[in-house]
Amino acid sequence: MIKRSNDFSSILENYFTKHLSLERKFSTNTYNTYLMVIRQYINYLSEQKHEKSKSISIYSFNKQNILDFLEYVEKILKCSPKTRNHKLTIINSFLEYAQSVNPIYLDIYLKSKSIKLKKFKLEKMDFLTKEELEAFMKTINIKSKNGYQHYVLIALLYEAGLRVSELINLKVTNLFFLSESPYIKILGKGNKERIVYLNNDVVSIINDYIDKFGITLGYLFLNHSNRQLTRFGVVKIINKYYELSKKECPTLMNKTITPHSFRHSKAVHLLMNNTALPIIQRFLGHSSIKTTEIYLDITNDEVSRSILKASSIIDNDENSKATWEGDDKLIELLENLK
């Protein structure tokens, strides 16, 4: 019989390098999330249970240890029930793979699988009304270089209904604007590809942005160091204009606005414009229409009166175009990107 420690190491390595990466074709973000949770659990065993690293095996994933870990996650780390459930799902995924490799781990997996998910009430996601969107966008100084980039970035978040990961991974090669119906090609969750069509106003400002920034290759949005913009970087940008827009639009004071709020707002606006749910599902890249149905919960009469029609948030005026010229050094750096 293979030693437990060696067996564990081998199964753990193959789970990530072969099963998740090659067989299930996980995206980088999802892969990293799974890796983080398993690492967190192993660190918990080492630091809280005082189990030596060399002695940690699949048998360390027993039901009591997992229950203690989940309690630690909720009570000490203050994670939500939703996060707690997600961590349990990831642990179960690993154990399911382990028992498929070696059936002696079936009992370990079944006992872990018997742990119930915690019920929790779904929090309603805040969305922006048409007026709030306009107020938000007006706080952006598009006459500045950074401001214009932020304007294009946020407009694209909303108009294309993008997830943050989809936005920051968007490359020039994902833009297909010469087509009769311009579109962008998105690689979403689970490496699922989808096409999002854009109206002419959006295409116009993106082309203007590309021209002024001299972008020919690589990622569409870069940070100050000319590196790929990060999720944290997008959050900082949104927070900056959220603080400014609250002063101009008091109704935003009671809302929590995140990068995802723009994707959610677009979905709500489409729904209120009587767009069929299957079309919204396809637009957002949801694998199940049940996920899309979450948006139905917030379409009450009050919201119906506040949203007239899904429309563009871009001011198609010449003044909305950048007035500064591109930086030659920036263009040179972008051209050298691999």
For each predicted feature, which ranges?
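Conserved catalytic core of the tyrosine transesterase superfamily
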Residues: 1-338
